[in-house]
Curated annotation (Swiss-Prot):
Keyword Zinc: no
MF terms in GO: small GTPase binding; tRNA binding
This protein's record includes keyword tRNA processing: yes
Any GO BP: tRNA re-export from nucleus
Protein name, UniProt field: Exportin-T
Keywords of this entry: Cytoplasm, Nucleus, RNA-binding, Transport, tRNA processing, tRNA-binding
Top-level taxon of origin: Eukaryota
Alphabetized InterPro entries for the sequence: ARM-like, ARM-type_fold, Exportin-1/Importin-b-like, Exportin-T_C, XPOT
Family: Belongs to the exportin family.
Compartments reported by the entry: Nucleus; Cytoplasm
């Protein structure tokens, strides 16, 4: 059997093997893996001499490994494996002969670890001592390199298997691991601790790899053994020289491992008094101070030889110490003397923490952010703050502010440093959180420190005639941007034209100095961006200090022409934000602005090349063009804002709109014929123009249909006339190019924006918009989005839309029904179908809710009434939990309930109240009472009897059930005894169901919830 397995492994792992033969070999090995009788053969292949090929030995041992791990092996076989492997290790490792390659050592370690887990309790109690004995050529020595390596590997692997808290384990496994740790503590922990000392003593200076391995194992085991076994003078006498060795720098893995070992020792859970005692015993404050003062971390700090690995290791140690000290101080039960010691240690460690927090390398800074965050949180809670704690705030805040500054070596936004830039901005966000915490602890200090940093920088800028490091100015502006958040929390800069707070008062002074200082002309892209961002964020300053607006507008006109593309593109958006917010204060400046930025308005579409979608392509030109176009739309919207200010005469507003739009109309004419011929460049150009027209309209009026506060405001006639030309131009292009997704997308966006400037004048054009936007090429998603727009139109113009809606409903529903009936071709298509169903039903609901239901039953749309009802009832009955069916079902039941309420006539029965004198139903049109009973009511019971409908276990189904109950009660309220008699004499008998309970609940429950509860219980009893 040994030979068969060996041959199968060789064939399976030989790339030259015949595929059919290889498949047979793999199948055979799969059988071997599940057959415990083959384990002996596999173990023989691993241990035999002469040795088999490495892959044969590795696979064979893996099969054994798997059998032990999955416990598919009896105790007797386990003991046999133990004896054979023990003998193999003794022959191979204890003798110091040629050992196995690393991959085999790893697999052997894993197998032995699984044997430890299975037999250490009973069967191999001497496991640890046996492998320690292989570490020396003579009894009690540790001079056998291969034996020591295997012993340390096993100790590390045992920890990972039974004590690593980062690995989630099942309950039984956790229980087993607790027992094994207890057994190790009772039997072998003293032996293990002594072996650490022996190995470090013998191999220190002889083999750094062994010393490093030992330190890492100590760091692991210290978390679950008695701390005194490691923290004693003998071990420390060995550790301290390792921590302090090689002070002049250079990579030293042993030194880093020794510091990591201290870090793990400090991290061990223990009582506060014991933790303080250990930190003092280890004299960690002095140890860390000496490391910081060593040439490796001090003299070489600002050089390329700086030992970042060492710095990160020491930073991690400091982070753990400070974190533990904060936890002790947060514990209200800690004894006063222990608290006093913790406070003293915190005073010692804070400068050490801030040293690493201020490190030029952000990775090192990030290492101590967790403990600094914990400290700041503790200080925020410790109110009122004792003087000792208050004194900590200033150095912490100063360190945070300084860390916000760009490094002296950084070059802003160079192409090859964009990743570094993104990482730095992410660090700034983390630092901002820390800074906010300081503000929460002591706002007055925060205001003073930041005011000083910002004010002194502005003063230096003035004194040095603008000759200042851009990094310092960027820091001041960044802090100014953050500083203003205090004013936002307090309700803004001004209250009744006066500063709302001390912080607001300071920010107002800063804003004035910033605008007056000439910073806007400082020649650096970072400064230009910061300046604009601040102006936009604190626009309310300019509402009160209007004298600065012309100056800042002039600066923005300069920024929108900036030579740096990042500044230029961002400025287009910020310029729009600025003028939109201040449209009431900018005055009649449209003509000047339009003349100043007219050179930026021409649109130039760039068609993506075929390889732009290739993942391997690094050409970002198309993305850049797309970003630039989207930013350019902000210029059009900004012009719309400026042109429509209250101080600009209406005639002038119309002229400005015409001035901008006429070139766009001409551009459409130039490109339309080529676009109709399929020219992608021309089509995309028209797409851009349509978007630009919509953006200009949005600038003139950002009102959307349905906004109650402005719904009654009619657009000015002169402006409506101008933008009616825009609507005609867009429709002209859309009708010619409705097969183009890009053109439809642009037109749909502009449709909603033109509503704001055209109002009811858009309504007669709706049929043309629908014809263009809902073409045969339109996707379900497009139709759903347009229905969502129509919801707003119906709501916003419900008094004026009746006739238009009546005329467009049939063609609209034809397109919707056609799309609903199309087969689903994939997951995305299914999602779009679900969205279309919801939007279609919501649109019908909006019509009914806005007293426009008559259009659904008008003579013009009568032919579509029955298909409408069929679609609604069909969607109500579709309750499988996929493709959003349940959400659509809920809306469909709501639609039927609305129809019952609107067309069912007056209420003749009230649930919860007896019918004293029966009154016949009086539906809005004849026969609708019977329609409710014969068409709507059966839908409810089809759903209730559908096995896919499970309101007992599914929240969405339960929601559908509630709507269903509402429909049943609505039918009863409109038809009264007619419905009850139908249920008693016809419906329930034909089903063979006792419906008396249902009828009783429907008639007597004052709310639908009672009936829904009855139906839920009925379904529970049926289940």
């Amino acid at each position: 059997m040994d030979a068969q397995i060996e041959k199968a492994i060789e064939i399976a792992w030989d790339p030259r093997s015949d595929p059919n033969l290889k498949e047979q070999a793999v199948q055979y090995l799969t059988q071997v893996r599940g057959d415990t009788s083959s384990l002996q053969a596999c173990l023989n292949l691993f241990t035999r001499a002469p040795k088999a090929a490495e892959v044969v030995r590795l696979v064979s041992l893996d099969i054994v490994n798997n059998a032990i791990q999955t416990q598919h092996i009896d105790d007797q076989s386990l003991r046999g494996l133990k004896e054979q492997l023990h003998d193999y290790v003794r022959r191979t490792y204890a003798s110091g002969n040629e050992v196995d390659p690393p991959a085999l050592q790893n697999k052997l370690t894993q197998t032995l670890t699984f044997l430890f887990s299975s037999l250490y309790k009973e069967g191999w109690e001497s496991f640890i001592r046996d492998f320690l004995s292989f570490a020396g050529h003579q009894n009690g020595s540790v001079d056998n390199l291969s034996g020591v390596v295997l012993y340390l590997r096993l100790l590390s692997s045992i920890h990972d298997e039974i004590a690593d808290l980062m690995i989630a384990r099942a309950g039984e496994e956790t229980k087993r691991n607790v027992e094994l740790k207890d057994l190790v503590r009772a039997r072998d922990v003293h032996t293990v601790a002594a072996s650490f000392q022996q190995i470090l003593t013998y191999w220190q200076g002889n083999n750094d790899a062994i010393v490093e391995m030992t330190l890492k194992v100590i760091g692991k085991w210290v978390s679950w053994i008695d701390i005194s076994l490691v923290v004693n003078q003998d071990i420390l006498n060995l550790l301290f020289p390792l921590v302090g060795r090689n002070p002049n720098g250079g990579e030293d893995k042993v030194k880093d491992a020794a510091i990591d070992c201290f870090t793990e020792i400090v991290a061990k859970k223990m009582k506060p008094s014991d933790k303080i005692g250990m930190i003092l015993f280890l004299n960690l404050g002095e140890v860390v101070s000496q490391l910081i003062s060593s040439p490796a971390l001090h003299d070489l700090r600002n050089t390329s030889s700086y030992d970042t690995d060492l710095a990160e290791a020491v930073a991690k140690l400091v982070n753990n110490v400070v974190s533990d000290l904060v936890k002790i101080l947060e514990d209200a039960k800690v004894e006063p003397d222990v608290r006093a010691q913790a406070e003293q240690l915190l005073q010692t460690f804070l400068p050490l923490l801030l040293r690493f927090f201020s490190d030029e390398y952000d990775e090192i800074c990030a290492t101590v952010i967790p403990s600094l965050t914990e400290l700041n949180t503790f200080l925020r809670k410790a109110q009122p703050l004792p003087p000792a704690y208050s004194a900590m705030l200033t150095p912490i805040l100063n360190a945070i502010i300084q860390k916000m500054r760009y490094d002296d070596t950084s070059s802003y936004a160079d192409e090859d440093e964009l990743t570094d830039e993104a990482e730095f901005q992410e660090l700034r966000k983390r630092l901002q959180v820390l800074q906010k915490t300081i503000a929460a602890v002591d706002e007055a200090l925060y205001v003073d420190v930041l005011s000083n940093v910002i004010g002194s920088t502005f003063q230096r800028l003035d004194e040095q005639n603008g000759q200042i490091d851009w990094r310092d100015l960027d820091l001041a502006l960044h802090e100014m941007y953050l500083f203003g958040e205090l004013t936002l929390v307090n309700g803004g800069l001004y209250a009744k034209s006066q500063p709302s707070s001390i912080a607001a008062e300071r920010l107002i002074v800063m804003m004035s100095k910033m605008v007056e200082s000439g910073i806007a002309s400082f020649n650096h892209p970072a400064i230009s961006l910061q300046y604009m961002e601040i102006c936009v964020r604190y626009c309310s300053f300019f509402e009160n200090q209007t004298q600065y607006i012309p100056q800042v507008l002039e600066q923005f006109v300069s920024f929108v022409h900036h030579s740096h593309s990042r500044v230029r593109i961002r400025s287009w958006y910020l310029f729009h934000r600025f003028v939109k917010h201040l449209r009431g204060q900018v005055g009649n400046v449209a003509e000047t602005i339009i003349q100043s930025i007219s050179d930026l308005l021409p649109l130039k579409a760039e068609v993506p090349r075929e390889n732009d979608d290739d993942m391997s392509s690094d050409d970002g030109n198309h993305d850049a063009a797309d970003v630039a176009f989207n930013a350019q739309l902000n210029l059009y919207e900004a012009i719309g804002c400026i042109s429509s200010t209250t101080s600009t005469p209406i005639e002038k507003q119309a002229i400005y709109a015409r001035t901008i739009m006429d070139p766009l109309f001409s551009d459409i004419e130039r490109n339309l014929e080529q676009a109709k011929s399929g020219n992608a460049q021309a089509t995309l150009q028209i797409h851009h123009i349509i978007f630009a027209l919509g953006s200009l309209a949005h600038g003139f009026s950002d009102w959307s249909p349905g906004e109650g506060k402005r719904a009654g405001q009619a657009p000015v006639k002169e402006i409506t006339i101008e933008f009616s030309r825009a609507a005609e131009a867009i429709l002209f292009a859309l009708e010619a190019l409705k097969a183009s997704f890009e053109v439809r997308n642009a037109a749909r966006s502009s449709f909603s924006r033109l509503m704001g400037v055209m109002g009811v004048a858009m309504l007669p054009l709706l049929p043309r918009w629908i014809d263009g936007l809902l073409s045969q090429s339109s996707s379900k998603e497009e139709i759903a989005m347009f229905l969502r727009l129509l919801d707003q139109v119906v709501f916003g113009f419900k008094k004026d839309i009746h006739e238009v809606l009546n005329s467009l409903l049939t063609p609209l529903f034809q397109r919707v029904f056609a799309s609903l009936s199309e087969p689903v071709t994939g997951t995305d298509d299914g999602i779009q179908l679900a969205e279309l169903r919801r939007e279609y039903l919501t649109f019908v609901t909006v019509i009914l809710n806005n007293e426009l239901g008559s259009v659904l039953v008008s003579e013009q749309n009568q032919a579509f009434f029955d298909p409408l009802i069929q679609s609604v009832t069909s969607l109500a009955k579709t309750v499988t939990n996929e493709n959003g069916n349940l959400a659509a079902s809920k809306i469909a039941f709501n639609v039927m309930t609305k129809m019952a309420e609107i067309w069912g006539g007056p209420t003749i029965a009230t649930p919860g109240q007896p019918i004293t004198s029966p009154v016949p139903s009086q539906p809005t049109f004849p026969g609708f009472d019977s329609f409710l009973i014969e068409r709507f009511h059966p839908v409810c019971w089809e759903v209730l009897r559908d096995p896919n409908f499970r309101p007992l276990v599914d929240a969405q189904s339960k929601s559908v059930l509630n709507e269903l109950a509402g429909l049943e009660q609505a039918i009863y309220m409109k038809t009264g005894n007619m419905f009850v008699e139908h249920l008693q004499g016809n419906f329930f008998p034909s089903m063979g169901v006792d419906g008396s309970g249902f009828i009783k609940s429907m008639v007597e429950s004052p709310e639908r919830k009672g009936l829904a509860t009855f139906l839920q219980n009925w379904m529970k009893g049926k289940a």
